[in-house]
Amino acid sequence: MRVSEWERVLYRAIVAAGLKPIPQFSIEQYDLDFALVEGNRKLAIEVDGERYHRSWTGELCLRDQLRNQRLIELGWDVQRFWVYEVRDELQRCVRLVQDWIDNKRTDAV
């Protein structure tokens, strides 16, 4: 599995924030860009690249929707970021991941 530069950028930023993402996590037939596991809660983090998603067809859109739906059925939350979000708003992306952790901790209390 090829890792994009923007996946590396987001990974480093999430790690720098004190979180422990698992890169290239496999679940069923899917390879997640990252996974965060917090107790019994699981977050799939995906970086949607410009090249891959530049010319969305109905097939690509449907495939990602089915993937998200299956992950949710398996008990995962899904957070997707576009490359431009990682590039232009990196700290906001990290904050969204941290908010997920904080919200899930609150839910568990």
Residues of each region from the PLM?
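Nucleic-acid endo/exonuclease domains
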Residues: 1-109
